[in-house]
Curated annotation (Swiss-Prot):
Task of the protein: Involved in the TolC-like protein HgdD-dependent secretion of schizokinen, a dihydroxamate-type siderophore. Transports schizokinen from the cytoplasm to the periplasm.
Effect of gene knockout: No secretion of hydroxamate siderophores. More sensitive to high iron and copper concentrations than the wild-type. Impaired growth in the presence of either 500 uM ferric ammonium citrate (FeACi) and 0.5 uM CuSO4 or 1000 uM FeACi and 1 uM CuSO4.
Signal peptide: 1-25
Name of the protein described by the UniProt record: Schizokinen exporter SchE
TM annotation in the entry: 40-60, 74-94, 105-127, 138-158, 163-183, 215-235, 252-272, 282-302, 305-325, 347-367, 368-388
Similarity comment: family membership: Belongs to the major facilitator superfamily.
High-level lineage: Bacteria, Bacillati, Cyanobacteriota, Cyanophyceae, Nostocales
GO biological processes: siderophore transmembrane transport
Length: 396
């Protein structure tokens, strides 16, 4: 079990670092440059590959890259492309070549989200059903540790050693993290039957959507983490408006808050085994949505570091528990032979909901204020908890 968890942890750390770095560092930088909230909200569109990756997941399910293994081969390929993109980005001057920078950021998101398809599929096949609670806690923890590096440590490094050397350091770390998958030997999986392109491409989607309660479940996935998506983006310009420095924001949101996410994800993994998926989704989701409202405290003008640390730790910890429960439930919806497509389609729906919510929240924050968007995002996510109780029942 331990080797499996170490492998998955390194994979999820590596793929989450660059996207987190761009999405978390850039809003802070843009707000410091006095850019408007509606413009910052549109940053969500740059992670569009995460919302559309289900479109190419059937190819990753069906095809393999020579002798590298099936999902292992795709992971190695996309990880090397990701590292190469980061190294190129290191030598781009953001102010003089903003378009080139945004292009590289989009490519990094594309390669990272594509690697995520193969990694999730590998995890589905690697973990037994009874291992998935802890396995998804490791996934959440790996993502969060990647976020600590990409969104916390990197903000501090940017302030100390500058853009170029920060990204070179990041690329070296990601290269080292590639070692476990290079030495891993993937077991051969049952191959899908040969068929026409049309049938082979659409069959996994049709199969998933034809399962009982598939559409209501996807609607739950669409709404469940919207509160997290909105607050994760908008709390950054809010803290800039409260006068916090780049290192301060890096420590609060990138290191301390995400450390709380790791601990709470591991706790959630153990609790999920005891409570089951549905009860965990309801309880963790309800608590997370209520604590989201704590962000109203800095929104109304409170700038005490002690208060901000406390609020951010509580919100991030509870949102992480809800996220872990959702990942576990999503994995249960997957078939082994179409693991990449089944899981990725659910993740894509979740990301599309988050992208739409962040873009809309940026526009609303400009006119209605931060407090309004925090209340609305919590209300929308609470709707998904209500839907779970209606479709599956609290006693499930």
């Amino acid at each position: 079990m331990l080797p499996k968890l170490i492998l998955l942890a390194t994979l999820y750390i590596s793929q989450f670092i660059p996207t987190t770095f761009f999405i978390q560092a850039l809003p802070v930088f843009m707000r410091q440059q006095k850019m408007s909230l509606d413009v910052i909200g549109f940053l969500g569109l740059l992670i569009l590959p995460s919302g559309l990756k289900f479109l190419w997941s059937p190819f990753i399910d069906r095809y393999r890259l020579g002798k590298l293994g099936h999902y292992r081969g795709w992971i190695i390929c996309f990880q090397l492309l990701l590292i190469s993109t980061m190294l190129v980005t290191a030598f781009i001057d953001i102010q003089d070549n903003l378009n080139a920078f945004l292009t590289c950021m989009f490519l990094a998101s594309l390669f990272s989200s594509s690697q995520d398809i193969a990694t999730d599929a590998l995890a589905v096949n690697l973990l037994e059903p009874q291992e998935r609670g802890l396995g998804n806690a490791i996934q959440s923890g790996g993502n969060i540790f990647g976020a600590i590096i990409g969104g916390g440590v990197m903000l501090i490094l940017l302030d100390k050693i500058g853009w170029r050397y920060s990204l070179i350091t990041l690329s070296i770390f990601m290269l080292i993290n590639l070692v476990p998958i290079l030495i891993y030997r993937e077991k051969s999986q049952h191959q899908l039957e040969n068929s026409t392109f049309f049938r082979s491409y659409f069959q996994p989607f049709i199969s998933f959507l034809s399962r009982p309660k598939a559409l209501p479940w996807l609607f739950v996935v669409l709404l469940y983490m919207m509160g997290d998506s909105v607050t994760s983006l908008m709390i950054r310009p809010l803290l800039v408006d409260r006068g916090l420095s780049l290192p301060d924001i890096g420590w609060i949101l990138g290191i301390v808050s995400y450390s709380a996410r790791i601990v709470s994800a591991l706790i959630a993994g153990l609790v999920i085994v005891k409570l089951g998926r549905i009860k965990s989704l309801i309880i963790f989701g309800f608590i997370a949505d209520l604590t989201t409202l704590l962000y109203i405290i800095p929104a109304i003008g409170v700038s005490s570091l002690l208060v901000l640390y406390t609020v951010c730790i509580i919100v991030n910890a509870t949102q992480s528990m809800a996220y872990t429960a959702l990942l576990s439930a999503m994995m249960d919806k997957c078939e082994k032979n179409t693991a990449a497509t089944d899981y990725t389609m659910q993740v894509s729906v979740m990301f599309l909901g988050g992208i739409a919510a962040t873009v809309l929240s940026g526009m609303l924050a400009t006119t209605m204020g931060y407090s309004f968007i925090f209340i609305m995002s919590a209300a929308v996510s609470l709707l998904s908890v209500f839907l779970i109780t209606q479709e599956y029942g609290v006693s499930s």
